[in-house]
């Protein structure tokens, strides 16, 4: 991709110098538990990429807190603790979830006196039952398949300092919202919001998810690479689903393998690639930081917004 003029671009080697002497707080085993099962992130990636990123987030967080204090003083209002929200966007299968979980772990390590929490916007998809009623099952993941009113209200409650907020839970295992199961957000200092739509501007909304984010990251890669990771992930899902009849992927796991792979290729072509090209990729240049991946999920370049 051609570098936008409003970003500073860094090679991996340049970026790693920004925190070259920092101590790595993870082991290989703890990293294995964090990463998605087809993501090849290494301890070296954590050292080279994520440690400097956490230090940058720390600067952004400190600046944000100071601005909140100064604004309260100017308005002669009591100072309130308003959560700092980090948005992480990008295509399916590009590694957003791993990036979000890793950032959560590292922030918990370095921000020892702050509450760090993570939420995914998948929980705000309409249930499969509701999607069928709206004739939207073939559009699952597209902007109209999300309950944006509920997501915006959730983020507003977070910023407003509501003490306990419930968020619906989505399960990739059952491919649906889990009834009567919730994640609880308890007045965090930092909330990480991960999802394909964190930078989108739906045409029927007056306020957007990005209006609530204070620092945003877009995880980027060539679509042909993302497709290979998508298909690789599908193969791994089949390998883990064949012993569990409750798993959404079970029928594909025990059925004809070639037919299952052909279906996954159609899903990528007709749904996920289309969604990427029409709705996700156009949001890339709205991010504060772009993390670019190449073969093997290796991060080779980072772009940081200048202004």
Curated annotation (Swiss-Prot):
Where does it primarily localize?
A: cytoplasm
Q: Which Gene3D superfamilies match?
A: P-loop containing nucleotide triphosphate hydrolases
Q: Which family does it belong to?
A: Belongs to the prokaryotic pantothenate kinase family.
Q: State the gene name recorded for this protein.
A: coaA
Pathway it belongs to?
A: Cofactor biosynthesis; coenzyme A biosynthesis; CoA from (R)-pantothenate: step 1/5
Spell out the reaction equation it catalyses: (R)-pantothenate + ATP = (R)-4'-phosphopantothenate + ADP + H(+)
Provide the top EC class: transferase
Q: Which InterPro entries match?
A: P-loop_NTPase, PanK, PRK/URK
* Compartmental location: Cytoplasm
Q: Where does ATP bind?
A: 90-97
* GO molecular function terms attached to this record: ATP binding; pantothenate kinase activity
What UniProt keywords apply to this chain's record, in alphabetical order?
ATP-binding, Coenzyme A biosynthesis, Cytoplasm, Kinase, Nucleotide-binding, Transferase
Identification of the protein by name: Pantothenate kinase
- EC number of the protein: 2.7.1.33
Annotated organism of origin = Levilactobacillus brevis (strain ATCC 367 / BCRC 12310 / CIP 105137 / JCM 1170 / LMG 11437 / NCIMB 947 / NCTC 947)
A Gene Ontology biological process term: coenzyme A biosynthetic process
Q: Which GO terms describe its cellular component?
A: cytoplasm
